[in-house]
Amino acid sequence: MNDTLIGLAERVRQAAAAKAILRIRGGATKQSMAGVISDAATLDMRSYAGIVDYAPSELVITARAGTPLVELERVLAERGQCLPFDPPRFADADGRLSGTVGGMVAAGLAGPGRAAVGGVRDYVLGLLLLNGRGDLMHFGGQVMKNVAGYDVSRLVAGSWGALGAICEVSLKVLPMPPATTTLRFDMRPADALESLHAWAGQPLPLNASVWWRDTLAIRLRGAHAAVAAAVQKLGGEVIPPELGHAFWEGLRDQRDEFFIEARQAAERENSALWRLSLPPTTPVLPSFLDTLIEWGGAQRWIVAGAEDTLVMHRAERAGGSAFRVSGGVGDGAGYATPLAPALLAIHRRLRESFDPHGVFVPGRPMRF
């Protein structure tokens, strides 16, 4: 067994014996969402890094948790492949894109392409997990047909460290699309949602969409003929490729104009950036300071009061949930729609089975 893994497992066993708590650390690019516990020691995963195996012909790559996400994507790009769910690449406090593969899976965050291609958990084939007892546990594998423990691998995606520290992960990857085109339309929000819902029922290579301030942008991806036919059918303004690429990258990494303004507003006044997960058919929600709509209406970013219970109330009434990403008191994030009692009980039982001693302090989205 790798010496670094042995050392990490021993740290966890010592913490369990001492009834101490550990905070799992990767690139520290999501601390505003995860929150910080001052009395928790750090289990730093960055030393366990590197590509373990890559089979381009099989569309599978296995990497250690501390591997920088930008490094993984560079390796894939050299072979014309990618992570199609557009995982955000956030910067740390020093402005570096230091996010890790383990952090990507633990947070389970996806970007503009999520609605079309699926999320992080849909691409996790297997992983090596260090649980709260200090045991290393293998789940899943490196091929789709090897399904032993497959559901557990998916369960870890988006668990924010509640079930243990991800050590290695095998991911399904896809070839880069042959053609990409961005179209722009001038539309009111209700018209944009209506159009997106209509287009979703048609055989169009619609890969991503976003509406903000009466402008709808869509990304078409696929075969050259399919993209060209869709452009002819839908109309709109064709955005030059280099501008379109920069636009979607900014949206993916949350460094475009909307997110910059939202964070500036949160610093100046008692407002916050919220993420709403809603049924796509939910109508426009008025009365917020600013709104950006993604995923055909399923994900909406809004700027509203930091302690605004109306945000959660409206999300719940629509059959969805709300999470405060930044802003508010302290380190800001984490104010969220409570889980239903039955679902909360399931979450707690799962966590107790993987971490019976409560060694790991999960990110705030999974802190009950």
Regions found by a protein language model. Name each.
Residues 1-24, 45-95, 109-142, 177-185:
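N-terminal glycine-rich flavin-associated loop
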Residues 5, 35-39, 46, 239-368:
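Conserved glycine-rich FAD pyrophosphate-binding loop
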Residues 23-24, 207-212, 291-295, 324:
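Short beta-strand
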Residues 24-30:
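Glycine-rich beta-strand-to-loop/alpha-helix junction loops that act as flexible
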Residues 70-72, 190-195, 225-232, 281-288, ...:
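Short, conserved charged micro-motifs
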Residues 85, 96-205, 209, 216:
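FAD-binding subdomain of flavoenzyme oxidoreductases
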Residues 180, 186-249, 253:
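A conserved active-site cap/scaffold subdomain adjacent to cofactor or substrate pockets
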